[in-house]
């Protein structure tokens, strides 16, 4: 006897009038999913068609809700990895729109009618901005680290300080990336102290490179020391080896002076090592990309690696990166939104908060607070900001606002909106969304 004989037929559910407005493939998928789930957790209770349809509609609504959507970042974390890190300026998007929506010369030389290099679009601008010999772009900085090590150190040894063997988001660890690249890791020093002699004593006939990794997502305080890349580079030159700086983040131009102390500047560092890499969507404020700068001979080896085909970027990334580079070269820093948010004056942030507070139908309090840089950058630094606090259960309020795509935070048991990360062009939308809520 078929124990599922009481279940409505899939076709009957798909053809039900209440699902008529949904595309066939979507409703067919969720009808099958819901029925399979109920069969898995089978009980002898009667399964009604109405109950199944209710569950199917719930699943479909959740599915549509899961689409990528714009949100208002009121968290106070400027480079928020879970919210897409850096934001692209509308004018940069408009400049790229024609390329993205049409065929383009991404790998075609319009001068001679032959195949061209996809990197040509950004190569000259990178060399100009950072004063480096050569450059390359891959899909993120983890890919850059992998490509550099695999191209320059395969089956050889790389030396790294124990204090710099970091773990980045999603449990990706530098030692595991090194291993996956086909390179042997030699750890030197301790978690809090590493000296130049530690590197020197570890060099052997199989050593290819000394790796320095910037501690961008944590801060080491108290009794500690590390060797700067300039001194490491002097050592490798003497020994006939290579130096590589995995910068991760790093800044380029026009960054808030409160943040730049002890934070490496890319243009300076590229002169102090053989090769370095950093993320395009962190402090640089552009799209996700791994940007590699260095000696022409070394970048040439990276370009010959067959893995580059798997790690290359597409026309969207190249288009947006190209426009970001143009903004930097023209010193049009207002178009680099990450820089603008980090540099915004406290009085401007207060003005934004007051404009919203004045229009809200709910009672709020204006307070001073601190914002974070985020994105695994500058963990020991914060920026002054203004917040609005809301009365009520903080967790319930956080959930309620999240349903309206407003991402705030809880601070001192209060739900707050941080106005450093709320852009001026979002203020009216924010007011409208909050005022449409019935009760908080």
Swiss-Prot record:
Enzyme class: transferase
Cofactors that this protein relies on: pyridoxal 5'-phosphate
EC number: 2.9.1.1
Coarse class of the protein's main subcellular location: cytoplasm
Protein's pathway: Aminoacyl-tRNA biosynthesis; selenocysteinyl-tRNA(Sec) biosynthesis; selenocysteinyl-tRNA(Sec) from L-seryl-tRNA(Sec) (bacterial route): step 1/1
Compartments it resides in: Cytoplasm
Any Gene Ontology biological process: conversion of seryl-tRNAsec to selenocys-tRNAsec
Described purpose of this protein according to its UniProt entry: Converts seryl-tRNA(Sec) to selenocysteinyl-tRNA(Sec) required for selenoprotein biosynthesis.
Enzymatic reactions: L-seryl-tRNA(Sec) + selenophosphate + H(+) = L-selenocysteinyl-tRNA(Sec) + phosphate
Modified residue annotations for N6-(pyridoxal phosphate)lysine: 282
Keyword Chaperone recorded: no
Pfam families (UniProt xref): SelA
Family matches, as InterPro entries: PyrdxlP-dep_Trfase, PyrdxlP-dep_Trfase_major, SelA-like, SelA_trans
Matches recorded under Gene3D superfamilies: 3.90.1150.180, Type I PLP-dependent aspartate aminotransferase-like (Major domain)
Protein name per the record: L-seryl-tRNA(Sec) selenium transferase
Family per record: Belongs to the SelA family.
GO cellular component: cytoplasm
Molecular-function annotations in GO: L-seryl-tRNA(Sec) selenium transferase activity
Organism, scientific name: Campylobacter jejuni subsp. doylei (strain ATCC BAA-1458 / RM4099 / 269.97)
Origin superkingdom: Bacteria
Keywords: Cytoplasm, Protein biosynthesis, Pyridoxal phosphate, Selenium, Transferase
Disulphides: none
């Amino acid at each position: 006897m078929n124990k599922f004989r009481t279940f409505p037929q899939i076709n009957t559910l798909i053809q039900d009038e209440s699902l008529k407005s949904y595309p066939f493939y979507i409703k067919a998928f969720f009808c099958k999913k819901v029925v399979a789930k109920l069969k898995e957790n089978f009980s002898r209770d009667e399964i009604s068609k109405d109950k199944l349809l209710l569950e199917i509609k719930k699943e479909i609504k959740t599915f549509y809700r899961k689409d990528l959507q714009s949100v208002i970042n009121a968290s106070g974390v400027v480079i928020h990895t879970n919210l897409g890190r850096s934001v692209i300026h509308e004018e940069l998007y408009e400049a790229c729109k024609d390329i993205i929506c049409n065929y383009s010369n991404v790998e075609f030389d319009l001068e001679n009618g032959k195949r061209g290099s996809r990197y040509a679009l950004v190569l000259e601008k990178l060399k100009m901005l950072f004063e480096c010999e050569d450059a390359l772009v891959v899909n993120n900085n983890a890919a850059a680290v992998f490509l550099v090590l695999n191209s320059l150190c395969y089956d050889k040894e790389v030396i790294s300080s124990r204090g710099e063997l970091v773990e980045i988001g999603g449990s990706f660890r530098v030692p595991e990336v090194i291993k996956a690249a086909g390179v042997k890791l030699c750890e030197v020093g301790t978690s809090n102290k590493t000296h130049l002699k530690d590197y020197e004593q570890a060099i052997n006939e199989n050593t290819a490179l000394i790796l320095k990794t910037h501690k961008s997502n944590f801060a080491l305080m108290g009794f500690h020391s590390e060797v700067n890349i300039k001194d490491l580079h002097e050592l490798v030159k003497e020994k006939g080896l290579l130096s590589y700086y995995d910068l991760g983040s790093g800044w380029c131009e026009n960054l808030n002076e409160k943040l730049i102390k002890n934070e490496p500047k890319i243009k300076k560092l590229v002169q102090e090592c053989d090769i370095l890499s950093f993320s395009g969507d962190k402090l640089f404020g552009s799209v996700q990309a791994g940007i590699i700068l260095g000696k022409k001979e070394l970048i040439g080896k990276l370009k010959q690696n067959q893995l580059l085909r798997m790690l290359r970027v597409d026309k969207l990334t190249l288009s947006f990166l190209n426009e970001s580079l143009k903004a930097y070269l023209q010193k049009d820093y207002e178009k680099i939104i990450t820089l603008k948010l980090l540099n915004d004056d406290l009085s401007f942030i207060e003005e934004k908060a007051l404009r919203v507070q004045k229009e809200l139908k709910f009672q709020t309090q204006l307070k001073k607070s601190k914002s974070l840089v985020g994105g695994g950058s500058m963990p020991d630094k914060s920026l002054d900001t203004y917040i609005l606090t809301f009365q009520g259960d903080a967790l319930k309020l956080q959930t309620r606002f999240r349903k309206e795509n407003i991402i705030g935070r809880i601070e001192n048991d209060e739900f707050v909106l941080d106005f450093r990360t709320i852009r001026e062009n979002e203020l009216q939308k924010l007011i409208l969304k909050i005022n449409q809520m019935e009760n908080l």
